[in-house]
């Protein structure tokens, strides 16, 4: 049985990435303060359809994701369909796979096209760290249910007397891994210590990311893949990511204190991604349908892979597990790639994965390979800057990476590119695209 993955429909047509778009990414409580993930999702999907001059009635499926879920609109995908002029009968459902969420939504639509169930679909994701599901304590929640059942005033007073002042305080969403209680930042600290990643190297990678992102924006290369967002009450707009340090100075990074291990740590706010708001989306079609409608795709999906590892130690190693599987399914080696886009959740996590790509020991012990994945050529790696600069709205990052690598390959005359990410829960995702 061949290990090659056939990302094609029954007619042998490839899955085309026709277009991609995102909102600018904004730090928490700044430009998108008060704007929900749903509103950002509708915003970007509407604009993507408009720019592509695609009849919304032709869209047969929308798969959209969110990580910080809002109880008021648990199926964000369906709400986007209802708010963007698509047929009310358009198939729509929501997914969540932590930071790999929009990789998952893209693959789900691709697989629907591969099976012949649909010909045209939209995938993406959105998250807001500024509009959060603030909840109540477990004790108060229990009491509220009991109050609803209580019949007499005396019963209600008895229930209320069980509560202390701290039980009445609002509870923000947890930032820790449910299974371990560790935050992503604490995991990044773990990885820095396990793999001997220095503070200087972390700061240098962050500086590189901000410098390249600034150059990319100033060159105009992101103009066609980032929309201008007008935010209610429509007295202002945002047309550029606002986390990028446009005058990044490497020496200034050393001034920050460690954020997660104050005494012995090396992970700081400057070499980590901030909490971010934003949304992204891509249009996928069968190759034949794209051609019939007159589109010139920005790329095609060649292979993809998802993996999972234990969460207790160094769980953000997803790229080191998912990438070799995606390469194998594409019949490729790392050196065959033209570009590599790796999600930079933390500089420590990124550098640890880069180190393990080149490790024969890791390949033999963890992957069962007789050779390393390969040393990363920095002239191919995150050439436009990465998440450390752009920011990281959890569910939006995957389709941001896919669009960005496809469009950069297009500018370079074609080739193959890798988009890969780690994710909470020990998850990993990788996708290889080809561009003509």
From Swiss-Prot:
One of its GO terms (molecular function) is acetyl-CoA C-acyltransferase activity. GO terms for cellular component: cytosol. It holds the Pfam family Thiolase_C. Pathway: Lipid metabolism; fatty acid beta-oxidation. Its EC number is 2.3.1.16. Transmembrane segments: none annotated. InterPro entries: Ac-CoA_C-AcTrfase_FadI (IPR012806), Thiolase (IPR002155), Thiolase-like (IPR016039), Thiolase_AS (IPR020610), Thiolase_C (IPR020617), Thiolase_CS (IPR020613), Thiolase_N (IPR020616). GO terms for biological process: fatty acid beta-oxidation. Its main location: cytoplasm. It catalyses: an acyl-CoA + acetyl-CoA = a 3-oxoacyl-CoA + CoA. It is found in: Cytoplasm. The active site is at 99 (acyl-thioester intermediate), 392 (proton acceptor), 422 (proton acceptor). SUPFAM superfamilies: Thiolase-like (SSF53901). Keywords: Acyltransferase, Cytoplasm, Fatty acid metabolism, Lipid degradation, Lipid metabolism, Transferase. Heterotetramer of two alpha chains (FadJ) and two beta chains (FadI). Belongs to the thiolase-like superfamily. Thiolase family. Catalyzes the final step of fatty acid oxidation in which acetyl-CoA is released and the CoA ester of a fatty acid two carbons shorter is formed. This is 3-ketoacyl-CoA thiolase. The gene is fadI.
């Amino acid at each position: 049985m061949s290990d090659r993955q056939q990302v094609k429909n029954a007619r042998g047509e490839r899955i085309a990435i026709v277009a991609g778009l995102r909102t600018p990414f904004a730090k928490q409580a700044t430009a998108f303060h008060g704007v929900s993930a749903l509103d950002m999702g509708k915003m970007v999907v509407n604009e993507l359809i408009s720019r592509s001059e695609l009849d919304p009635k032709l869209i047969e499926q929308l798969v959209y994701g969110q990580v910080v879920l809002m109880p008021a609109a648990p199926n964000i995908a369906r709400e986007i369909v209802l708010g963007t002029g698509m047929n009310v009968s358009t198939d729509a459902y929501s997914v969540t796979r932590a930071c790999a969420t929009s990789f998952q939504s893209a693959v789900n639509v691709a697989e629907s096209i591969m099976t012949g169930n649909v010909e045209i679909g939209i995938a993406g994701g959105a998250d807001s760290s500024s509009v959060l599901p603030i909840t109540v304590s477990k004790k108060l929640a229990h009491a509220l249910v009991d109050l609803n059942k209580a019949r007499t005033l005396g019963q209600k007073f008895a229930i209320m007397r069980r509560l202390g002042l701290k039980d009445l305080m609002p509870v923000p969403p947890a930032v820790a891994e449910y299974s371990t209680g560790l935050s992503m930042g604490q995991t990044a600290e773990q990885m820095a210590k396990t793999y001997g990643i220095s503070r200087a190297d972390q700061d240098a990678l962050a500086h590189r990311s901000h410098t390249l992102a600034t150059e990319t924006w100033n060159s105009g290369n992101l103009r066609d893949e980032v929309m201008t967002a007008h935010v209610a009450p429509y007295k202002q707009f945002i047309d550029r990511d606002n986390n990028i340090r446009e005058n990044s100075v490497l020496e200034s990074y050393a001034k920050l204190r460690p954020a997660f291990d104050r005494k012995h740590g090396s992970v700081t706010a400057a070499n980590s991604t901030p909490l971010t708001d934003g949304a992204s989306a891509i249009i996928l079609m069968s190759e034949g349908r794209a051609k019939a409608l007159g589109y010139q795709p920005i790329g095609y999906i060649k292979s993809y892979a998802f993996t999972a590892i234990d969460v207790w130690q160094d769980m953000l190693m997803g790229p080191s597990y998912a990438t070799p599987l995606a390469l194998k399914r594409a019949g490729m080696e790392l050196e065959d790639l033209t570009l590599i886009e790796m999600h930079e959740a933390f500089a420590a996590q990124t550098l640890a994965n880069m180190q393990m790509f080149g490790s024969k020991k890791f390949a033999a012990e963890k992957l069962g390979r007789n050779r390393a994945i390969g040393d990363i050529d920095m002239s191919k790696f995150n050439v436009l800057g990465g998440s450390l600069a752009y920011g990281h709205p959890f569910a939006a990052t995957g389709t941001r990476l896919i669009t960005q690598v496809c469009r950069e390959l297009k500018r370079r005359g074609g080739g193959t590119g890798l988009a890969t990410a780690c994710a909470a829960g020990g998850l990993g995702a990788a996708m290889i695209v080809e561009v003509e």
